[in-house]
Swiss-Prot record:
One of its GO terms (molecular function) is GTP binding. It comes from Neurospora crassa (strain ATCC 24698 / 74-OR23-1A / CBS 708.71 / DSM 1257 / FGSC 987). This is Tubulin gamma chain. It is found in: Cytoplasm, Cytoskeleton, Microtubule organizing center, Spindle pole body. Belongs to the tubulin family. One of its GO terms (cellular component) is gamma-tubulin ring complex.
Amino acid sequence: MPREIITIQAGQCGNSIGSQFWQQLCLEHGISQDGTIEDFATEGGDRKDVFFYQSDDTRYIPRSILIDLEPRVINTIQTGPYRNIYNPENFYVGKSGLGAGNNWGDGYQTGEQVHEEIMEMIEREADGSDSLEGFMMLHSIAGGTGSGLGSFLLERLNDRFPKKIIQTYSVFPDTTSAGDVVVHPYNSLLAMRRLTQNADSVVVLDNGALSHIAADRLHVQEPSFQQTNQLVSTVMSASTTTLRYPGYMHNDLVSILASLIPTPRCHFLMTSYTPFTGDQVEQAKTVRKTTVLDVMRRLLQPKNRMVSTVPGKKSCYISILNVIQGDVDPTDVHKSLLRIRERRLATFIPWGPASIQVALTKRSPYVTMAHRVSGLMLANHTSIATLFKRIVRQYDGMRKRNAFMEAYKKTAPFSENLNEFDEAREVVMDLIADYEAAEDANYLNPELGENASADTDKRMA
């Protein structure tokens, strides 16, 4: 029984990433630009219906809702090479076409005005599923639409579908440089509250780390958004391969998330992918040889993480799931795990199992890969809190001066007071405290904290 997933793309960033993601999925499943199956795509074994449904004329249509408050990116999709695969009823473009002006409040209040139309699209897609497992939202949290309207939709989805999983792929701003959006600390903090309270799992991608990886792997000084979006769509397609080419384990979202998220609040995941090759990304550096050990070792290198964090002395992994694609012998996997353990390449929480979980998955027979093995790591790591701390620090600096506050006060959520900001800050501070507490051996029984012994560092020993 397929467990369907509906994708919701909100804002410029969400739609740009989404459009690349659907192109990648079409290539991997042998679906042509108009949704028909290519003549060569005769091998079975894949589950197309998790992400696509078949129309009356047997074309494959993405289970996707595309939402933006300004028309530019959606116009590009509607005139691009893959324009015919989407359901034309599933586009929502803001009536004024002005966007949300990089203002969370603007995006959120627009959500209140237009939610009936958008929820109707979502409910129509949900009704068309046999056994809906959940939603995947793609957005960025720095601007107005992805963060504000995205926040509103997360709340609504949670109310309307309380039993369904909500996973987001959230692009965080580059907190190490000024960036294009001056008010990103405000927007990010407000969106973070909803990601903490209304999503089951958040895959964090940050523009800073994506640019570093793109610059390093692709030899370009200033990577374009298209290149960084390509990295994101590669990660998204890899993280969904176990759903689309199912094996015995990790073949639905619930089982993937259950293995990664032991406590409900700490559900922010980081990713690494290797090797990025010319198949997914133009002019990528070549990696001469890929063995399972080599791929697994590279996945653990901090420079391959798609999040800029500053690990402290006590930072550690809460959980790791490696999705290994390609021609792999399970005994190689076992040997590689032993080697990683012997060399203590990964430090784990002191209160849980110190194990890297591995999902071996087929790769698409229709896409030629330059490498024998490629891998994606989905990890829950306590150092992600350092990214949240940077956002709070930047928010505090701006809030102290009341910088740019007038624009927010003009919107409905802030018309009477600024409590929304204070509540969001409190939620994010609690989240940071939760991740820091997870580094402690007595996380599960805090009352023992006073008598903790010093030797709780748990590397894979």
